[in-house]
Amino acid sequence: MSEATTTLDGWYCLHDLRSIDWAAWKTLSSDERGQAVSEFLNVVEKWNEVATAKKGSHAMYTVVGQKADIMLMILRPTMEELNEIETELNKTTLAEYMVPAYSYVSVVELSNYLPADEDPYQNPQILARLYPELPKANHICFYPMDKRRQGDDNWYMLPMEERKKMMYSHSKIGRQYAGKVRQVISGSVGFDDFEWGVTLFADDVLQFKKLIYEMRFDEVSARYGEFGTFFVGNILPDEKVEKFLHI
């Protein structure tokens, strides 16, 4: 049997994507819509306070295309907190005019290839990646993915050293985009329908296409990668939420 990779796990992660029922939203009076927006922003302010205390992080983006209208990415220390956040949001008036479009549950993950005598949880660089402050980049790209398990192309039957070698080659491509694309990898085996979630942040949206296309030619993606639905969007600052929902 092949050896399993040891992972380092950080904050739990929820991607919550929703569509707005614009027709129903229009039936509210201007005052009613204003109250609903204020209530929602009060919830977001609680998230901001958590982020300031460095006990979690979040990101809010509008989604381009018909798959959804808004994407929320929430990071918290426990799965229970993610559930509480989702429930609190569902109890708001605004949620009555939202339709669930997609969700993904995972945990921020790194593969542990450090020497056995080194404690990764004492390494500041690793801690910053396991418990990240999500960037306020202009754009986001999220997609889930699996490693293929078919016939001779079975990632999980490969020896550990071969997997390490291929992942090192794969990661070199990503490092070429340092400063252009920020990446958060989250593991979801046993949590959701795919094995990983990949979230990319960039100020130049074209960098998503360039990075993902270049990685397609690497063996890890070309031979072993299987991908789910892609979602891409634009940042939605708190101060622009009212304008986004204005009728």
Curated annotation (Swiss-Prot):
Catalytic activity, reaction form: Fe-coproporphyrin III + 2 H2O2 + 2 H(+) = heme b + 2 CO2 + 4 H2O; Fe-coproporphyrin III + H2O2 + H(+) = harderoheme III + CO2 + 2 H2O; harderoheme III + H2O2 + H(+) = heme b + CO2 + 2 H2O
Its EC number(s): 1.3.98.5
Entry-linked Pfam families: Chlor_dismutase (PF06778)
Active site: 143
Keyword Metal-binding: yes
InterPro entries found in the cross-reference section: CHDC (IPR031332), ChdC/CLD (IPR010644), Dimeric_a/b-barrel (IPR011008)
Free-text comment on the cofactor: Fe-coproporphyrin III acts both as a substrate and a redox cofactor.
Primary role: Involved in coproporphyrin-dependent heme b biosynthesis. Catalyzes the decarboxylation of Fe-coproporphyrin III (coproheme) to heme b (protoheme IX), the last step of the pathway. The reaction occurs in a stepwise manner with a three-propionate intermediate.
PANTHER family: COPROHEME DECARBOXYLASE (PTHR36843:SF1), HEME-DEPENDENT PEROXIDASE YWFI-RELATED (PTHR36843)
Protein name as annotated: Coproheme decarboxylase
Origin species: Bacillus cereus (strain ATCC 14579 / DSM 31 / CCUG 7414 / JCM 2152 / NBRC 15305 / NCIMB 9373 / NCTC 2599 / NRRL B-3711)
Recorded name of the encoding gene: chdC
